[in-house]
Curated annotation (Swiss-Prot):
Species of provenance: Mus musculus (Mouse)
Protein name: Lysine-specific demethylase 5C
Other known facts: Escapes X-inactivation.
EC number: 1.14.11.67
Disordered as annotated region, ranges: 197-227, 284-303, 1319-1364, 1437-1535
A UniProt-annotated Pfam family: JmjN
Family under the similarity heading: Belongs to the JARID1 histone demethylase family.
InterPro entries the UniProt entry points to: ARID_dom, ARID_dom_sf, JmjC_dom, JmjN, KDM5_C-hel, Lys_sp_deMease-like_dom, Zinc_finger_PHD-type_CS, Znf_C5HC2
Subunit structure: Part of two distinct complexes, one containing E2F6, and the other containing REST. Interacts with ZMYND8.
Predominant localisation class: nucleus
Residue numbers binding Fe cation: H514, D517, H602
Catalytic activity from the UniProt record: N(6),N(6),N(6)-trimethyl-L-lysyl(4)-[histone H3] + 3 2-oxoglutarate + 3 O2 = L-lysyl(4)-[histone H3] + 3 formaldehyde + 3 succinate + 3 CO2
Length: 1554
């Protein structure tokens, strides 16, 4: 978008007012207040208070309207004159059958109107040609010099303008006695001037608002068309700026030529206006010679652009027609072949008689000069805004408006500066080259569509907030009918004046220069949307503005004198200001008011999409302007909206209802009106008209009582005729009624001349009633007659002013102030009297001083009204003065009795007046009271006061009257307070110090502070802390000197209490050390027993399983522990916290727990043994039984049965044993066929709750426990567990040492040796030949089987994978060869072994006897091939996962190397998950031993398998009983247990050194 280069200079801003809430409550009063300032500018802006925000009350969904169409360059007066001229000249050429194109000169369209005006101003065409001043014409048209533009302008003028100007002058018309044209009739009523055919072009329903800025495009090829038959082509096509320039791209199609000579030239002469590049324009003609004398010769062009084609008349064969063909110019009929017949009037003209003469016979339609002139002078159609064809809602109009603005300015609507829109608006309205069309929803009736303000009616219920705005004076529905407004006396709802109009605007939509009807005020409120830009001219410059506009555009005002009243004409404010018209501007934003004053011209446009509401109102100061407006309308013969006389008379008929200022203004106006009416009726009598009749004009419609001459609405009187009943005139135009005789005319009147003065008198009484009242008030307030009026009389005067609605004058304000002051005095005097009666209990602070009492009495005497309360006040003053004298005497006589002073003080309080001596009395009394309080506080027998009391006494002492006794008491109080604060601070430091002081120091501080007679809170706190410390020490001594070592819980409680005490305690450090040692031991024990991330506590593991008998209970408890939901019960043995302190009770409870555990496991084994196996469950389709800790349905292959509880578990959910772990660790030389030594024993996680350390590991914990002076529940549980394990070990050794079992063990040894000896010849069978290596593979495989988990480098990864695979293949291959049992176990032997096996599996300790019994039981039954097969499958799956993880680790290592980082150790990465996933007792034992080695420094030696001949087994078994029975002494079990452990491990001499 390219904006114009002509800058618009904004006019100065109009006044802006921001009323306060007090001013805002009276709208018309505030407007009257600002009128002296704002009226000088014509318009002003008012910003309401910030919180005045009326709700928008329009029903948006139902609001539909049809806007007006506005073509911007039709609005501006000067632009419209140019476009009208272009219409006329285009019409001139069109009616002659020729087409016209507006040429471009210097890349801009030629302004033909300005060219014509300048030629006239320079002296005319002939003068300019004679003086060769065409260059000056080009200069005045702002063309650059030196480009021969003057010649171009002359050519264009000669071809286009000059013929039109000659026709307009009428120089070549025949002067004949023809009937005059219609427009020459005298007193013809002019129609409003406008642009022809504009309203015949309906706007398009689509794309109606596109900016047509680039319309000056290359000229289209001329199109031959029958213009007469095609009505569309008769319309004018635009090539310039606006819809008023006619379409100039068509040529008339040749019709039948009316020539006598068929041999005439085929191509008529043509005037050509041709546009060339660079603005160089030439005029060419197809004729070889020019047809205008004295003109320059022109070049020729074979391609004309503009043609004027004419034709000859028809050749008729009848002779009588030939005789009638006479030229209208020369009156001759010769050379009839040169005669032309006009298509309009059939007159004949010689082609050489025309001006200018035609060299040849023209073609097409031709009209004579007379017809051309008549057509050009035809009055145009009325100008006005067209209505759009589309109906909008607010939403659809807003979308259209925002879209138009955003597209036009190529930016979001809210980002377009208002200055840019303003400049662009005035550029567009002044341009004839661009045509922008917008729509404006103007003058929408709020009565029909609803107001934007809330309205109190019955249509809908209003909220309290809406009700407030509905009654506000600033509501535009309320303001016109306010009491001070004149329009409230008009009954009719005048739309636009009394009833608001609504305006929905879009960018560039404008309202033209105008003043309000009857020169009234107007107020406009912008509800929401983008700003509205206003321009205003004050009323003093209204006539100047009209003169300037008439001077600049006389063509418009000659035909329409009231053009400015039609709201269709703009003129640039800069143009007006350049001619001396004062103009102001403002941007009205949402929520702001704009007020225009009487006869203030205003105009403006909208910055974008918005919604405004406007209405008129009239105040008392408007009445003179309204009367002048009627006279102005009478001169312009404009219709009135209402009758001004009727309004005045209607207000005069009820003067009591008028505001006083309004009554005075109406009286003045009516006086002038009555005088004028007397003069006019007198003139009527002088004319001889005496007939009259009364007429109630207010009952007649306005159109029936309008003067037929000046259109004024009559009310007081009118002149009518009996013979011409259809019309009447006002008395100012009595000569214009009709031609009838005066005797037939009569006066129609509303009031007689006697009635009018009566009405005037009532107004005068109303207006002058204020003066009468004011005189009464003045006499009363000034006491001019020497008599004070009573209070009632003054109130009556004030009531009269209120009832008669007198104005708020200074005198009324004085009266109100006097009444207010008098009533205040009466009320105060009554309060003074009632205060004396109430006595000293009245409210403090209401007493007046003696000086105030004297002033009050003087104030009452000075008031202009009489009050009987003055005597009461005088009596009170006398009493106060007498009391003052007595008080002075009492104060002078020292020392006075305190009782006397107190009684005087109480008497003074009853007076109700503050006497200065009373304050001295009060100070003396307060001094005595303070000294007494200090004496009581410091007395030895008194209760000790607090520091706050001491400080309060010091503060109170500073305000009492000074005396030596007071000074001494203050000194004693200050000294005592200083000492007390010093000791309080010392105690505070002791309580808050980081380094705690010993009890002795605190005792010394407390002892010294006891001598201070003040209550010290910190010293008291120190006493309490010291008492708690002594009690704590006593508790420590008691617990340390008891029969047993103290429990850890007790010590922890004492430590917690001791740490909180602000006393340094030596015993606390000892207790903290003991607690720390106990915690360290418990942590070591936890590491020894508990698995990583175990869900069991140490105490739970060491104690017997309390819920071993219930499978569901165990499973649910295990699941809750895994989820972190289950919290273990500390009373695992069924003992309370107090019972746990007795070692004997703990041992007995542990024994009972063992028995319950055995019974429970037997019951559980019976229950689980009755369960079907997972394979059996698979065969039953409807089975929903669940197994394992996961609680899922059986998984088939991969399920294992626990050897202790006999329940089933998924191999993927639990840790499973490795088949060859025992082969590799303990018996590496045994052959694989010794299947009873395979590690196939499986204990579920519910049965194997801990790591199950060996006894030698437990021995170190017991030795450390024996050194602890603290008792732990875990320690005693460990002791009991060890006793239980040793007891089971003794019984197991006894059974293993029996002859039968010893023989069975020997048989197994022989069988193992025989299998070892037979293994070498079978190596070739076990491993088939591979690559030529037959028997050499077995040692390699055996080595791999022995060291399968020892991969330590990346090079061995592939080897390990191969060996692992071979291990599994080898085991799978030998399964069919397994057979058994290899031993025969008698039932007498098997039963004790199974019982021992079960009891040993319950122990959370690892014992070698357990393994020996397991091998015997395994060898005595067939091999469990199903379990072996399951273990093989699980191990295959695990190894496959290990290979996958290994490859991933290797890829990660390689990527790290590629990035330049240090590669990870693949062996370490591979072993880490294996150690985590390793299972079985051996794996856990390895992990356990590694951790224990870290704790003990690697001094844990291995314990060999005990032989059957151990002499200590029976001794250990026998020595256990006395230990279990003598549980009362804690030292005995520890010493005995340690010695028995040493006997159980005879090859560990180093244990004695522990």
């Amino acid at each position: 978008m390219e904006l114009g280069s002509d800058d618009f200079l904004p006019p100065p801003e109009c006044p802006v007012f921001e009323p306060s809430w007090a001013e805002f409550r009276d709208p018309l009063g505030y407007i009257a207040k600002i009128r002296p300032i704002a009226e000088k500018s014509g318009i002003c802006k008012i910003r309401p208070p910030a919180d005045w925000q009326p709700p928008f009350a329009v029903e948006v969904d139902n609001f539909r309207f049809t806007p007006r169409i506005q073509r911007l360059n039709e609005l501006e007066a000067q632009t419209r004159v140019k476009l009208n001229y272009l219409d006329q000249i285009a019409k001139f050429w069109e009616i002659q059958g020729s087409s016209l194109k507006i040429p471009n000169v210097e890349r801009r369209i030629l302004d033909l109107y300005s060219l014509s005006k300048i030629v006239v101003e320079e002296g005319g065409y002939e003068t300019i040609c004679k003086d060769r001043r065409w260059a000056r014409v080009a200069q005045r048209l702002n063309y650059p010099p030196g480009k021969n533009i003057g010649s171009l302008l002359r050519s264009h003028y000669e071809r286009i303008v000059y013929p039109y100007e000659m026709y307009q002058s009428g120089a070549n018309l025949v002067q004949c006695n023809t009937r005059p044209f219609d427009n020459e009739e005298k007193d013809k009523e002019y129609k409003p001037h406008s642009i022809p055919l504009r309203q015949s072009v309906q706007p398009s329903k689509f794309n109606s608002y596109g900016r047509r800025a680039k319309r000056l495009q290359p000229d289209p090829e001329p199109t031959e068309e029958d213009i007469e038959k095609n009505p569309e082509l008769k319309k004018l096509q635009i090539y310039g700026a606006g819809p008023k320039m006619m379409g100039l791209g068509l040529m008339a199609k040749d019709k039948t030529l009316r020539k006598k000579d068929k041999e005439g030239p085929e191509c008529p002469p043509t005037v050509v206006v041709k546009e060339e590049l660079g603005g160089d324009v030439k005029m060419e003609s197809t004729s070889p010679k020019t047809f205008l004398e004295g003109k320059e010769e022109l070049s020729h062009s074979p391609e004309p652009c503009t043609k004027m084609t004419m034709r000859l008349r028809r050749n008729h064969s009848n002779a009588q027609f030939i005789e009638s063909y006479v030229c209208r110019m020369c009156s001759r009929g010769d050379e009839d072949d040169k005669l032309l017949l006009c298509d309009g009037c059939d007159d004949n003209y010689h082609i050489f008689c025309l001006l200018p003469p035609l060299p040849e016979i023209p073609k097409g339609v031709w009209r004579c000069p007379k017809c051309v002139m008549a057509e050009c002078k035809r009055p145009p159609e009325a100008f006005g805004f067209e209505q759009a064809t589309r109906e909008y809602t607010l939403q659809s109009f807003g979308e259209m408006a925002d879209s138009f603005k955003a597209d036009y300015f190529n930016m979001p609507v809210h980002m377009v500066p208002t200055e840019l829109v303003e400049k662009e608006f005035w550029r567009l309205v002044n341009s004839i080259e661009e045509d922008v069309t917008v729509e404006y929803g103007a003058d929408i009736h709020s009565k029909e569509f609803g107001s934007g303000f809330p309205v109190s009616d019955s249509k809908r219920h209003l909220t309290p907030e809406e009700e407030e705005y509905a009654t506000s004076g600033w509501n535009l529905n309320v303001m016109p009918v306010l009491e001070q407004s004149v329009l409230c006396h008009i009954n009719a709802d005048i739309s636009g004046m009394k009833v608001p109009w609504l305006y929905v605007g879009m960018v560039f939509s404008a309202f033209c220069w105008h003043i309000e009807d009857h020169w009234s005020y107007s107020i406009n409120y912008l509800h929401w949307g983008e700003p509205k830009t206003w321009y205003g001219v004050p009323s003093l410059a209204a006539e100047h503005l009209e003169e300037v506009m008439k001077k600049l555009t006389p063509e418009l005002f000659d035909s329409q004198p009231d053009l400015l009243h039609q709201l269709v004409t703009l003129m640039n404010p800069n143009t007006l200001m350049s001619h001396g018209v004062p103009v102001v501007r403002t941007n009205q934003c949402a929520g702001e008011f704009v007020i225009t004053f009487p006869r203030a011209y205003h105009s403006g446009f909208n910055q974008g999409y918005n919604f405004a509401e406007a209405v008129n109102f009239c105040t008392a100061d408007w009445l003179p302007a309204g009367r002048q407006c009627i006279e102005h309308y009478r001169r312009l013969r404009r219709y009135c909206v209402f009758s001004h006389e009727e309004l005045i008379c209607k207000m005069a008929a009820c003067p009591e209802k008028l505001d006083l200022n309004l009554a005075a203004a109406v009286h003045k106006e009516m006086f002038i009106m009555v005088q004028e009416e007397r003069r006019l009726r007198k003139a009527l009598l002088e004319k001889g008209i005496t007939e009259a009749e009364r007429e109630a004009f207010e009952l007649l419609p306005d159109d029936e009582r309008q003067c037929i001459k000046c259109k004024t609405t009559c009310f007081l009187s009118a002149l009518a005729c009996y013979d011409c009943p259809d019309g009447l005139v006002c008395l100012s135009h009595i000569n214009d009624l009709c031609k009838c005789s005066s005797s037939r005319q009569y006066l129609r009147y509303r009031y007689t001349l006697d009635e009018l003065p009566a009405m005037l008198h009532k107004l005068k009484v109303r207006a002058e009633s204020f003066d009468t009242w004011a005189n009464k008030v003045r006499v009363a307030l000034e006491v001019e007659d020497g008599r004070k009026r009573s209070l009632e009389e003054l109130r009556a005067l004030e009531s009269e002013a209120r009832e008669r609605r007198f104005p708020n004058s200074e005198l009324l304000q004085r009266l109100k102030n006097c009444l207010s002051e008098a009533e205040a005095c009466v009320s105060r005097a009554l309060g003074l009297v009632s205060g004396q009666e109430a006595g000293p209990d009245r409210v403090a602070g209401l007493q007046m001083t003696l000086a105030e009492l004297r002033d009050f009495l003087g104030q009452m005497n000075n008031l202009p009204c009489a009050m009987h309360q003055i005597g009461d006040v005088k009596g009170i003053l006398e009493q106060v003065e007498a009391y003052q004298t007595e008080a002075r005497e009492a104060l002078v006589s020292q020392p006075s009795s305190p009782g006397l002073l107190q009684s005087l003080l109480e008497r003074g309080q009853q007076l109700g007046v503050e006497v200065p001596e009373a304050q001295q009395l009060q100070r003396q009394v307060e001094q005595a009271r303070w000294l007494d309080e200090v004496k009581r506080t410091l007395a030895p027998s008194a209760r000790r006061g607090t520091l706050a009391i001491m400080r309060g006494l010091l503060v109170a002492g500073a305000s009492v009257a000074p005396s030596p006794a007071v000074d001494k008491a203050q000194a004693e109080l200050q000294e005592l307070l200083t000492i007390a604060e010093r000791w309080e601070e010392k105690a505070h430091l002791c309580l808050e110090a980081r380094q705690k002081h010993p009890p002795a120091t605190l005792e010394a501080i407390i002892h010294e502070a006891e001598n201070i007679p003040v209550h010290l809170p910190n010293i008291q706190s120190l006493k309490e802390a010291l008492a708690k410390a002594r009690a704590w020490i006593a508790d420590v001594d008691e617990i340390q000197n008891g029969d047993h070592y103290p429990c850890l819980d007790d010590l922890e409680g004492l430590v917690a209490v001791g740490r909180d005490l602000p006393v340094g305690l030596e015993e606390l450090r000892q207790l903290e050390l003991q607690v720390l040692t106990a915690h360290s031991w418990r942590e070591k024990a936890s590491k020894t027993f508990l698995k990583k991330n175990s869900c069991y506590t140490l105490l739970e593991v060491l104690c017997p399983c309390a819920d071993a008998g219930s499978d569901s209970t165990k499973r649910s408890r295990w699941m809750e522990k895994e989820l972190g939901l289950y919290k273990s019960d500390t009373e695992l043995l069924g003992l309370s916290a107090q019972d746990l302190r007795d070692p004997g009770s703990v041992i007995v409870a542990f024994k009972e727990g063992e028995q319950k555990e055995k019974e429970g496991i037997l019951q559980l084994r019976r229950t689980n043994s009755a369960k079907p196996s997972p394979l059996a469950l698979l065969t039953t389709a409807s089975s929903t039984a669940s197994i394992c800790v996961c609680g899922q349905v059986p998984a088939g292959v991969g399920a294992l049965q626990c050897d202790l509880c006999q329940d089933w578990f998924h191999g993927r959910c639990v840790t499973v044993p490795r088949l060859l772990s025992s082969q590799r660790s303990s018996l590496p030389s045994s052959p694989l066929l010794a299947w009873w030594e395979w590690d196939t024993k499986f204990l579920c996680p519910l049965c194997m709750r801990s790591r199950r350390p060996r006894l030698e590991t437990i021995l170190a914990l017991l030795v450390a426990l024996q050194r602890l002076p603290v008792r732990l529940p875990e320690g005693e549980a460990l002791q009991c567990l060890t006793e239980r394990a040793i007891s089971w070990q003794g019984r197991a050794r006894q059974v293993l040492a029996s002859e039968e079992v010893t023989a069975l063990l020997g048989r197994l040894a022989e069988l193992r040796q025989r299998l070892q000896a037979e293994s070498k010849p079978e190596e070739s069978l076990a491993y088939p030949s591979d690559g030529g290596e037959g028997t050499g593979n077995m040692p390699k495989v055996q080595g791999l089987l022995e060291n399968g988990d020892s991969v330590t480098s990346p090079e061995k990864v592939a080897t390990e994978e191969g060996s692992g695979k071979r291990d599994l293949e080898l085991l799978s291959s030998i399964l069919p060869q397994l057979s058994g049992p290899v031993l025969e176990l008698p039932e007498a032997t098997r039963a004790p072994l199974e019982e021992l096996m079960m009891e040993g599996d319950l122990l959370e300790v690892t014992l070698d006897e357990n393994h020996s019994i397991w091998q015997l039981l395994q060898a005595g039954q067939p091999p469990d091939l199903k379990r072996v097969q399951t273990l093989l499958e699980l191990e295959k799956a695990e190894r496959h996962g290990s290979r996958t993880r290994g490859r991933a680790l290797e890829r990660r290592r390689r990527r790290k190397v590629d990035r330049g980082g240090e590669p990870d150790d693949p062996a370490r990465e591979e072993l880490e998950p294996k150690r985590v996933r390793s299972s079985g007792p051996e794996a856990e034992e390895v992990q356990e031993e590694e951790e224990l080695e870290e704790e003990t420094g690697g001094e844990v030696p291995p314990v060999p398998f005990p032989n059957s001949g151990s002499p200590s087994i029976q001794e250990d078994q026998d020595g256990l009983e006395p230990v279990l029975e003598a549980g009362s002494d804690t030292s005995a079990p520890f010493s005995t247990l340690t010695s028995r452990l040493l006997m159980s491990c005879p090859q560990q001499p180093s244990l004695q050194q522990l």
